[in-house]
Amino acid sequence: MNPERQETISPKNVPFQPVPTPNQQSLQSRMLESNQAVPDAFQKVAAWNHYNAVATPPIGVPQTARPPSNQSPHPNPPGYPYQSHQQQFHPLAIAFQQPFGLPQQVIYPPPPPGFTPHRVQVSPVGLLGPPGFFPQFAGSTTSQGNPSEVSVRTKSAEGTTGPIAPSITTKPTSTIQVAPPRDPVAPTTSSSGITKKPENGEFSLVKTISGHTKSVSVIKFSYCGKYLGTGSADKQIKVWNTVDMTYLQTLASHQLGINDFSWSSNSQFIASASDDTTVKIFDVISGACLRTMRGHTNYVFCCSFNPQSSLIASAGFDETVRVWDFKTGLCVKCIPAHSDPITSISYNHDGNTMATSSYDGCIRVWDAASGSCLKTLVDTDHAPVTFVCFSPNGKYLLSAQLDSSLKLWDPKKAKPLKYYNGHKNKKYCLFANMSVPLGKHIISGSEDGRILVWSIQTKQIVQILEGHTTPVLATDSHPTLNIIASGGLEPDNVIRIWRRN
Amino acid sequence: MVEILDRTYGAQFPEELECHLDLQNASANCCKFNRWGSIVAVGCTDGRVLIYDFMTRNIARTFSAHCLPVSCLSWSRDGRKLLTSSADNSIAMFDVLAGTLLHRIRFNSMVTFAMFHPRNDNKAIVLQVNKQPTVEQFSPRIQTVLANDTPGSSDESASCVSYDRKGKYIIAGTGKGKLLIYNAETLKCVAWCKQNTVQQIRQIIVPMKSRFIITNTQDRVIRTYELEDLLHQRGQMVEAKYKVLDMVNKAAWKNVCTDSDGLYVCGASTKAHSLYIWESNTGSLIKILHGNKGEALLDVQWHPTRPIILSIAQGTVSMWTQAHVENWSAFAPEFQELEENEKYIEKENEFDMEDEDADEDMTSKSQDAEDDIIDVVNVRPEDYLASSDEEDCNIMKPARNLESGPLWYIPVPLDIENADNDQRLPDDIRNLDNLLNPAWVASAKGYELSPKSK
């Protein structure tokens, strides 16, 4: 073979020397084409030729490489047999192109070593993992953007609107770190602004619970009122006994921080939403993780049991609502609900209707059975909506916006009925709730550390609870007793229990 | 749910076949929705009764009720009890939540119909083959026969029977086309009348919310009467207020059902898997739903609150639902879909640079909002009773934990066999390989999956 190649090369060299400029252009285009078009099988051949070509520079191969490329761009009738001839020596042509590229490879030695660790890292895992491993790896890669492993809910909204996790947002410098007061009865400020001791009919601090090592992101009483659940950025959900607020159980199976959780109607199970893109079901008494639902492609920001506790709805930063069957753990519905991350999801009292809120400023009401959209509620300010929930009778919707306002909506008329102001809410997704024992109140935390209580009917601030030194995201009221629970961000990390006299 | 919509989208009757219920190798014979449509009971030919959670379509309970086909099912008012009747000459009553058998009564003949009293789950009406209907009281055990003591027709036997909407009257249909109305307390005949036919009445249907009763007669005509009109009759012939029939094929009706408002009537054909849907007051045929050829229909049921029909043919339960029509107006407020072009008349100040009346509008709006009384706790009776003229609203208020009130759902147990062992890993492994699935990495590195220390 070698003598034949030499013979074919030498006679063509003479007639094509006078045209050097088109040679260079055609040579470059051919190299690009060959690089793009060569399949994997031929890449090995090219690599082999590459090594073979390295040994030939002393012979003066670069000079002879130019003539064969001259032949290809000429579609002459006598060129037709040349093309057939060239097809026979296709590997040879590739071989002769490699030496021309040799200087580039010599100039850039670092790139080839950069690829080797990637292969080494991937292939052993591929051998160990099942075929479906790669999508989960992609999910993990998404989580990689959050190296501090802080729950996304406990970060401010300024840095969390994008699909890629941002760096840690600097905490507000105005916050003064003050030790919590040792006096168990914290001073309270009434609507008149005068600091005074708690009177009859007002909430007062009765207990401070420590247990979480990072920000408390969610607090919820169970429907029977016996348990209090607290979720945190330390990847744990702790359950407390509400009779004496003693520790009961820790639910720890998530890989990243907790964003939300929901109690089942019989208070036996908890469904939790986390940054690790999974929804998990825990048995409250034993603390065991019974099921892990995978399917979301980004942070799961909120989840909710339906009143029958047969379905779990979850939503998050992938802008979809997924409905999971509690019995089997399968995803029975996937609704692309909003055009921005979804911040809250809530069922009404009979489980027929579902409400979602989003950073796009919309609140959408859905038919839970068919998954169709019934209505969209938008106010004129289009502020991002961070929370939405139905009233106990399913007739009204309470929403929280990032313009420091709470709104009570009539979903039938699609307009807000009442506005509640006085707190500060610019960055975080706060929880709000309606407290119905002994009067109808709306309770919400604030980013300045206070907890505000409004009267639903008059919209007046009934009481302001002070004691937290960091923003209060998580608040909840007991279903039957006059108890409020609240949790603070880092470095507070404590749960405060307030009771009305 | 319908009230949230500004206007109805799509038809209010089923239009297409959606799916079949998973019967798990059973052969269905009859089915029945509870009051809210959240649970459906399916009676099978082998005597079993399957209770479905209709939202998830999962089987929640299974009762081995009988050894022969189940002929009829009836729910109590609060949904906590289920009455089944069968060809094995017996009826059985079950506690649905506990899954236990409460009563079983044996008869001498096959039982073709059994129905709870609408207001009293201690009473039921039972119809056996070739016998007069009997009123059964379970505790204490009393049986009373409904005698046909009308003049000139003592030998006619009842072919169908039903309570009226509130359980005040019992309506019986005879084999010669007569209707007898009894007082449910005294069991005395208070009225009787004739239809304009002497053929057998096969079925009497009482819609949940209307004042009508509907008869399915063997002459293939479905007649609608007003109950108040029948109460004044003493043997006269009464003309039907509305009547529907198949003008083309003259199909006979195996079973008839209506929606809860009584606006639509659905007839199940005896010869083919075809469901005919009429508008009740106009008698116009609006839809024919065709199933598989060669299948004979056994039962048909309309959902209490949704345009859904369950039909049973060849042992399979088919579900017919509305065609999905996307409601684009729901995604954007102030967006309205037009059926045809409309001439737009702009408002007075619509395009003004400055709104001169803005202050007044805002003032009036805020005043309107102030006057509204916000009630966030009380649920209106029609929301959970599907009717607004009930007298025991407080007793029937649903509770979330099912300790009181009606059984509006069945708690779902977790399928523990499929639960995954998602155990906690050592801290060093988790911190080191956060990107990967911890279980595989731990297995590859030879670490043992240690259970949680606490």
UniProtKB/Swiss-Prot annotation, chain A:
Alphabetical UniProt keywords: Repeat, WD repeat
Q: Where is the composition biased (Polar residues)?
A: 22-35, 167-177
Q: What's an example of a GO molecular-function annotation for this chain?
A: microtubule plus-end binding
- May I have one GO cellular component term? kinetochore
One of its Pfam families is Beta-prop_WDR5
Q: What happens when the gene is disrupted?
A: RNAi-mediated knockdown does not result in detectable defects in histone H3 'Lys-4' di- or tri-methylation in embryos or adults germ cells at 20 or 25 degrees Celsius.
Where do the WD repeat units fall? Answer: 211-241, 253-283, 295-325, 337-367, 381-410, 422-455, 467-499
Q: Where is this region: Disordered?
A: 1-35, 58-85, 155-197
List GO BP terms, alphabetically. Answer: brain morphogenesis; establishment of mitotic spindle orientation; germ cell development; microtubule organizing center organization; nuclear migration; retrograde axonal transport; vesicle transport along microtubule
- Per the record, the domain of life is Eukaryota
Q: What does this protein do?
A: Not required for methylation of histone H3 'Lys-4'.
Q: Return the similarity comment.
A: Belongs to the WD repeat WDR5/wds family.
Q: What is this protein called?
A: WD repeat-containing protein wdr-5.3
From Swiss-Prot, chain B:
Sorted alphabetically, the Gene Ontology cellular component annotations on this record are: MLL3/4 complex; nucleus; Set1C/COMPASS complex
WD repeat start and end residues:
23-64, 65-104, 153-192, 196-235, 248-288, 292-330
Q: What happens when the gene is disrupted?
A: Strongly reduced di- and trimethylation at 'Lys-4' of histone H3 in embryos and adult germline stem cells. Mutants also display defects in egg laying and fertility with defective germ cell development. RNAi-mediated knockdown disrupts development of the ASE left (ASEL) neuron, causing it to adopt the ASE right (ASER) cell fate.
The parts of the chain that form a coiled coil are: none
UniProt xrefs under InterPro entries: RBBP5/Swd1 (IPR037850), WD40/YVTN_repeat-like_dom_sf (IPR015943), WD40_repeat_dom_sf (IPR036322), WD40_rpt (IPR001680)
The cross-references to PROSITE patterns, in alphabetical order and at most eight, read:
WD_REPEATS_2, WD_REPEATS_REGION
Q: Which Pfam families did the record assign?
A: Beta-prop_VPS8 (PF23410)
Its localization reads: Nucleus
Q: Which UniProt keywords apply?
A: Chromatin regulator, Nucleus, Repeat, Transcription, Transcription regulation, WD repeat
Q: Tell me, what is an example of a GO biological process annotation in this record?
A: germ cell development
Q: Which SMART domains match?
A: WD40
Q: Which Gene3D superfamilies match?
A: YVTN repeat-like/Quinoprotein amine dehydrogenase
Subunit architecture: Component of the SET2 complex (also known as the SET1/COMPASS complex), which contains at least set-2, swd-2.1, cfp-1, rbbp-5, wdr-5.1, dpy-30 and ash-2.
Q: Summarize the protein's role.
A: Required for di- and trimethylation at 'Lys-4' of histone H3. Regulates left/right asymmetry of ASE sensory neurons, via its role as a component of the SET2 complex.
Q: What is this protein called?
A: Retinoblastoma-binding protein homolog 5
Q: What is the lineage of its organism?
A: Eukaryota, Metazoa, Ecdysozoa, Nematoda, Chromadorea
